Amino acid sequence: MLRRKAIPENLRSPLDGLRAVVAEVEAARAAMTATVPSTRLPGTPLAEAIAEFEAHLTGARDLMPRWRAPEVEEEWLGCEAGIEESLERARRLREDPPELGGFEGLIWVVDQVLAPLEAFEAAAERFRTLRR
């Protein structure tokens, strides 16, 4: 039987903190991707989605100190920068919305706002490498 490697005791609390932050980040992502219409739903209005996105990312930013630890400092800094950049892109989109020109433009804008949050994948991978 294969056993999953355990996270070191000193990283359990930071890992729980990361999970709490990721829950907010995922809710923010879901808010933005909900703007894209599907065959069954028209898509959330962009202004409404941006407000929800910013609220969830602000919540994520407030939770960030919970997972800061020397072993994951580089990843923590990357995630902090990713949140700040995504919030800045959302602010610019809210204050000066571009002409989207249809479905492709909307997809591009959503991708641009979400791209900095890819840093969280590196953080999750770092925690996986720290298991013993």
Model-predicted regions and their roles:
Residues 1-132:
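Long, low-complexity or tandemly repetitive, helically biased scaffold regions used
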